[in-house]
Amino acid sequence: MLTAVTGINWGDEGKGRVIDLLAEQADIVVRYQGGNNAGHTVVVGRDKYVLNLLPSGILHPDVTCVLGDGMVIDLEHLTKEIEALRGKGIPITPENLKLSKRATISMPWHRVQDELEEARLEKDGSAFGSTRRGIAYAYSDKYRKKTLRLGDLLHLNEGYIHNRLHMMLDAKNMELSGCYHQEPMSYPALLSWCENQAAAFSAYICDTGAFLRDALADHKKVLLEAQLGAMRDIDYGIFPYTSSSSTISAYGPIGAGIPGAPLSHVVGVLKAYSTCVGAGPFTAEKAMSESWKDDLRRAGNEYGAATGRPRRVGPFDAVASRYGLQCQNADRIALTKLDVLSSMKEIPIITEYLQHTKHIKDFDPTDNMDNLLPVIDIVPGWQQDISHCRSYDELPDNAKRYIETIEKLLGHEIQFISVGAERNQYLTKGEWL
């Protein structure tokens, strides 16, 4: 069985929490796109784990984790992430972590380029809100054929790799010295860096596509873990305020290394309210006062898992969520952080947008979204703790009414609801997985 877990909104929906739960019954968890530019947070007891590159299934000892073809991997960051988990007693070996030989390496200069360009753009206020982790530059060089893939580290003693390294270095030094006046990198330094990464990761690098095909043939349960959400997809998001990869479920099998493999289920994860990190149009933040947003941000601890940046927040946006649901083609919906709203006497929901005098019910990321205003309905809050609820019937009537209002606006049932950060603080209804 092949199941994708994806984000319906801007990311930070709680995918890591859902993956961690589903991984209890899974054999393999695969990250299929992105890099270390976002984080998935998993809470186990008193321990909180923030995973930027490693799949959320790494916390389960019987699960094999895969970094797939579609990723760009900062190996220095991966080393630190592995060491941090090992320091907490989490075993990581070539048996439970496999790196695709087709995945792209995020080279040291990609971070440098990202930082320099974002700093340049900030001078006139045109920055994109990059995480400055080199993701766009790693993907750019992938498509320009001016970078390495992980499998190349296994062939550093062969002449064709040396030729490619020289070609890459010459091109990159021209860019960095010509555009940004940086000191050029030497070939010995580049080769030494590659050799160090090969020594650290050669045992982990393999044909993960073949591994996954065999697993599916043996009827293993495979989870595909997306990074970010539909609004950050390079094609279907709010361009240019997107990530540099495809965040949608349809890309999952391709980025995992098993193109053509059919998805059994797609879980779309959304939050009980709206959040966004980074620049770009975000209509939901126009709906309420600054004090309301500050209270919500504190209640939900809405700060970026990868960057620590305060998230932009607003009410649940049904217009954006319908579009994200359509992009992901989800047949299951997980609603997270419902408990964060428990203190509110009244809860706003965005039902449509207003563009001058025109009512907008359909989300169009190619339109001018800066002049949209949110239209809200108010539903009564429940003002009581729900973190102990383990069945839908245990929820207060107004909490059920809030969920059912969202279901009606989305035209889709919600099957999973989290009522706290702990592993056991959730409930299901209808046909879950």
Where are these regions (language model features)?
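Non-transmembrane, aqueous-exposed alpha-helical and coiled segments at domain scale
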Residues: 1-433
